[in-house]
Amino acid sequence: MHEISLSDVSSLVGQELGTSKWITIDQAMINLFADATHDHQFIHVDPNRAAAESPFGGAIAHGFLTLALLSVMNFSGMPKFREQTMGINYGFDRVRFISPVRTGSRVHGRFVLSDCRLRRASILMTAYNVTVEIENENKPALTANWIAIAQFNPKDRPKAG
């Protein structure tokens, strides 16, 4: 995975910066997420009932599980800022769950840098248009605008331009 200098990041606005590795969402992962979030709706944890009573043909992943996987997708698919000391989630805008992710499906994330702004001497706020794609499906699982903070040592900060 290559690195990006913070002084170069503004020139990359509008460009795709990375695509993550594929992740298989199996029933065990869905069940663990259900346990962690106390969301045991049958469409997620009961494949037989979901096949019989839902329009999905079987169990599907929680939308929030798919959203939560963006962290690992970011680590596997995005270049790092060379001078960054840590990254922090700031939030999401326009999260949309487009298509269900069926048990056994593989997903990956695509990241397009949509904005970057120097906030303080050691803070760069970035925004990414993210898309989680489902293997062999035409429509994505979700789209969102992910806002993150890159913190770095003030002596290494990019010059405002």
UniProtKB/Swiss-Prot annotation:
Gene3D superfamilies: Hotdog Thioesterase (3.10.129.10). It comes from the Bacteria. Residues 10-130 form the MaoC-like domain. Keywords: Nodulation, Plasmid. Pfam families: MaoC_dehydratas (PF01575). InterPro entries: HotDog_dom_sf (IPR029069), MaoC-like_dom (IPR002539), NodN-like (IPR039375). The keyword Ubl conjugation does not apply. To the R.leguminosarum biovar viciae counterpart. Involved in the production of the root hair deformation (HAD) factor specifically on medicago. This is Nodulation protein N. It comes from Rhizobium meliloti (strain 1021). The lineage of its organism: Bacteria, Pseudomonadati, Pseudomonadota, Alphaproteobacteria, Hyphomicrobiales. The gene is nodN.
